[in-house]
Amino acid sequence: MLFEGKVADGPFPTLAGPGIALIPSALSHRGRLLEILATPQVRRWWDAPDQPEGWPADDPTEPDTVRYTIALDPGRGAEPTVVGLIQYAEMNVPEYRHAGIDIFTDPAVHGRGIGKASMRTLADFLFAERGHHRLVIDPAAANAAAIGCYTAVGFKPVGLMRQYERNIDGNGWHDGLLMDLLPDDLG
């Protein structure tokens, strides 16, 4: 389980990228992250904004998921501004070693490269430090902004997963796009 940035083989380091820091998620980030999840732009694509008690530092429904809080890098001594969350789960079978990634960011920072910087920073870590061969992500097929961000980082479409995920309102299903990234694709 994840406790203040620690998992079974943690703790995990803070990761620095251009203009951002990925900080191991802590309970102190919960309020701000729930605010971001509740925005209509994020809510459209993510599960309900009500998360289990202890989330994002500890989520008993996803004990193998590692979460990083995305923060704007304020420079020396200043408090970082929380603007989103990026998470991964690992498949540690040697023949299929890969990780799946999910991300959401505050709509106020959309279009500023924060998502791309966060994805590249986490991808670098997962390839170089965690030894993964492939990364995967599965946005809703209609989420053009997310797909554009992931494509800019180097993710390639693998295929359409029909009726992949239940709609937020619980009525019906929508398609997902499976995308993957190999180390040589990272842009």
Feature locations, PLM:
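Conserved active-site alpha-helix within GNAT-family acetyltransferase domains
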Residues: K116, A128, A141-G159
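Short amphipathic helical patch at the helix-1/turn junction of helix-turn-helix
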Residues: T105, A140-A141
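Conserved catalytic-core motifs of GNAT/GCN5-like acyltransferases
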Residues: S25, V136-P139, K156-G172
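Conserved GNAT acetyl-CoA-binding A-motif
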Residues: A128-D138
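Acetyl-CoA-dependent GNAT
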Residues: R44-H110, K116, F125, L182-L186
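A short, well-structured alpha-helix characteristic of acyl/acetyltransferase catalytic modules
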Residues: M1-A57, D184-G187
